[in-house]
């Protein structure tokens, strides 16, 4: 299936303000790209790029002194047209056998307070089977316990606060599940990106960026989604990190309120028409 992903973000500017951006599809999808994303900036501004400590592709710019800054992008990827299939490699590695790069994802972080949730985690999940069944039990619990409510979203809510309040949005589901996994000695990292509604019945909510997490099982990272808690078709990663603080779509070092926000993640046309768009993208 060809999947088109993209966005348009408009920020109101009142002074030149440095910004850091994580708005590209992740390199993990390199073999699926039909039309690569390209970050368009209006008005045109100098733009530089770098990779952060987690391997995410990031951009830097300074906003105009006044008016509006528009950031947009679109990409087309060839993704599996069927719902995700859970991996059969689901064993849980003892801490002493984990790769060095996994160890940081066992520790508490800004939004994932493992110290406050450790006793709770062991009380609830200490008797569950190791590996995928334990992670799935955590996802099942988070999915039942947290009520999704955009109206009660706040950017400072932590995993422990989500546990106490029982309400949140997709990032809160992911933070709580990540913290509980880490408390059970399962490395877990936070992910952000796109998830399509392909295969779901209408009505559809307005498209938004999404959050899920990956757990280290079977000797590799595997995706879990406590918000939806069901296989989905068309999941596209943008960034990974310890929690949402590491993968913010934009970090502005000054006042830049968001004036417009649209996200697209939907099936696209057949490959022959993509060639025309690819040429146009390179020429533009």
Predicted features along the sequence, with ranges:
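Hydrophobic/aromatic-rich core segments of domains that either
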Residues: 140, 172-260
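Short intrinsically disordered coil segments
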Residues: 24-26, 87-96, 227-231, 253-255
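Short, surface-exposed linear segments at secondary-structure transitions and domain or protein termini
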Residues: 44-48, 95-98, 231-240
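Secondary-structure boundary elements
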Residues: 13, 77-81, 87, 97-168, ...
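A broadly conserved detector of short glycine/acidic/proline-rich loop/turn motifs that flank catalytic sites
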Residues: 15, 25, 45, 75, ...
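Intrinsically disordered, low-complexity N-terminal segments that are enriched in acidic
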Residues: 1-90
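Generic structural "secondary-structure junction" signal
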Residues: 21, 41-43, 63-64, 79, ...
């Amino acid at each position: 299936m060809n999947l088109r992903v993209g966005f348009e973000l408009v920020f109101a500017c009142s002074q030149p303000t440095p910004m850091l951006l994580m708005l590209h599809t992740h390199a993990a999808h390199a073999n699926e790209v039909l039309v690569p994303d390209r970050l368009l900036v209006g008005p045109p501004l100098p733009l530089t790029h770098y990779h952060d400590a987690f391997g995410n592709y990031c951009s830097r710019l300074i906003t105009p002194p006044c008016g509006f800054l528009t950031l947009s992008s679109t990409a087309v990827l060839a993704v599996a047209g069927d719902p995700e299939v859970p991996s059969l490699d689901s064993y849980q590695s003892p801490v002493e056998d984990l790769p060095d790069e996994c160890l940081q994802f066992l520790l508490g972080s800004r939004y994932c307070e493992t110290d406050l949730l450790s006793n709770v985690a062991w009380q609830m999940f200490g008797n569950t089977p190791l590996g995928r069944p334990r992670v799935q039990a955590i996802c099942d619990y988070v999915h039942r316990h947290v009520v999704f409510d955009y109206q009660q979203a706040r950017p400072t809510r932590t995993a422990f606060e989500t546990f106490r309040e029982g309400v949140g949005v997709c990032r809160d589901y992911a933070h709580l599940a990540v913290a509980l996994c880490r408390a059970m000695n399962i490395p877990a990292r936070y992910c952000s990106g796109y998830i399509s509604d392909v295969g779901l019945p209408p009505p559809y909510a307005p498209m938004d960026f999404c959050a899920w997490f990956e757990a280290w099982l079977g000797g590799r990272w595997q995706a879990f989604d406590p918000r939806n808690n069901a296989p989905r078709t068309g999941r596209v990663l943008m960034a990974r990190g310890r929690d949402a603080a590491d993968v913010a779509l934009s970090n502005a070092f000054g006042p830049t309120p968001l004036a417009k926000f649209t996200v697209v993640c939907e099936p696209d046309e057949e490959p022959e028409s993509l060639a025309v768009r690819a040429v146009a993208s390179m020429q533009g």
